[in-house]
C-alpha cells in the first residue's frame, strides 16, 4: 500500500508537470513539497493509506525519499518512451534538438520527435534528455545515435531536423 501510494502520487505529479520537492521537507515544515503533501492529502480519504504512510511506517520503508521518487519517475519515463516508440513504429519522423544547461552547469540536450499520428495529425513528443560533454555536431550526432539505437529508432527514417 505504501509503494502503491507513492507510485500513484508520483504519477499524478508527473503527468500534471508539477514539481515534486519543496524547499523545506523537514518534519516541522508547513509545506514539505508536492509529493509529501499529496501523500498526506491522499491519506485523508483512505484509512488504509493513513495507517501505512508517513508517520506510521518504519523509517526505512516510507517510499518517499528523493531516490525513490527518481526511480519511480525513471520507470514512468521508460514506459512513456516505449509507448512513443510503439506509436512511431517504422514510420518516418523529424527530430528537434535543443541544448540547455542543468542546475549543475552540465550541458544537456533534449530530443523531441515530431510524428504524424494515425489520424494524420502532427504530434511532437518529448523523448529524451542526454547529458553531453561536447556540443560539436559530431558529438551531438553520436549521442542522438546512441539514444535512437537504444530504442531501435532508425536514423534512415528521419525526414527533417
Regions found by a protein language model. Give the residues of each.
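Extended, charged coiled-coil/helical-stalk scaffolds used for oligomerization and assembly
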Residues: 1-152, 160
Amino acid at each position: 500500500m505504501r509503494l502503491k501510494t507513492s507510485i500513484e502520487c508520483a504519477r499524478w505529479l508527473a503527468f500534471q508537470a508539477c514539481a515534486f520537492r519543496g524547499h523545506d521537507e523537514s518534519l516541522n515544515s508547513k509545506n514539505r513539497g508536492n509529493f509529501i503533501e499529496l501523500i498526506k492529502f491522499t491519506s485523508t480519504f483512505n484509512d488504509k493509506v493513513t495507517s501505512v504512510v508517513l508517520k506510521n511506517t518504519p523509517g526505512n520503508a516510507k517510499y518517499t525519499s528523493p531516490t525513490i521518487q527518481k526511480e519511480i519517475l525513471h520507470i514512468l519515463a521508460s514506459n512513456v518512451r516505449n509507448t512513443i516508440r510503439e506509436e512511431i513504429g517504422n514510420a518516418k519522423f523529424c527530430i528537434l534538438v535543443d541544448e540547455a544547461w542543468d542546475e549543475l552547469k552540465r550541458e544537456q540536450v533534449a530530443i523531441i520527435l515530431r510524428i504524424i499520428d494515425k489520424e494524420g495529425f502532427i504530434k511532437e513528443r518529448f523523448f529524451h534528455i542526454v547529458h553531453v560533454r561536447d556540443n560539436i555536431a559530431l558529438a551531438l550526432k553520436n549521442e542522438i545515435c546512441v539514444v535512437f539505437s537504444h530504442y531501435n529508432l532508425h536514423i534512415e527514417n528521419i525526414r527533417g531536423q
